[in-house]
């Protein structure tokens, strides 16, 4: 269960009980919030080409369709948009996907046949929510929830806390500057209001929040005072891994666009490329070599 307020989300796990092989039920929910629902589910014989698992997700309020995904087909540009319906914070923490059955009414998407920004539950209102999960062969599973418009009978989970100093409204553009390091964020880069840490400390530029995902590129300009052989910019990711970003300096900056937040710093490539000959000669009598560089990649191959 999600609470939707002022562009932010809070959630709490609901306990459900099995009624029969195809139907589950939850205890009555008392609330006066704007709410939404999310599910963790999968299909053992999934025949759909999507990141969600099931073929169709439907949500009804008092038997009226409120929201529906249908994965008959979708265009290639819609593939990244599917991620908007996944709880990214939960995925980072648990490596499991909650599919959100609410979204943005402004998007006209082929795989969304009915869209809603959530359910507004008013004082004294009573409603029955039915969530229907369907596989490709039209086998269905149902979840029934009863809503009462009253004071909440539950508490949302606490937010995951991390250091932050900027709150971003997705409807605004931002240009931040910290000691010459620049961050340029366009409108609608993030799906909802998001907190990030933008700071520079111990030779590291922080553009960081492990629990949010950018929907489109933002621009970073990393100020550099000197250029040494083997020098390049890298990004430290939330899981501790490092990713090569750039080794090109222009007008005193590493300037690049990315969707990935992280901690950016200068590193040095001290490992020479590896060249390995394939042991056997193929049927065309060709000799093959494998060329690998684990840090910055291969820039030029010269053969004599």
Question: Where are the regions that the model predicts?
Answer:
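Solvent-exposed, low-complexity, repeat-rich "mucin-like" stalks and linkers
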Residues: 283-296
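Predominantly extracellular/luminal regions of secreted and cell-surface proteins
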Residues: 171-193
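Long, low-complexity serine/threonine/glycine- and acidic-rich segments characteristic of extracellular
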Residues: 7-153, 253, 266, 294-304
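Proline-centered linker/hinge motifs at extracellular inter-domain junctions
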Residues: 1, 174, 270-274
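Proteolytic-maturation and junctional protease-sensitive modules
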Residues: 185, 211-264, 293-295, 299-304
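Beta-strand-rich domain onsets/edges
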Residues: 266-286
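Structural beta-strand segments of beta-rich domains
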Residues: 33-37, 216-220, 285-288
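Proteolytic processing hotspots in large secreted/extracellular or virion-associated proteins
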Residues: 154-171, 192-236, 276-278, 283
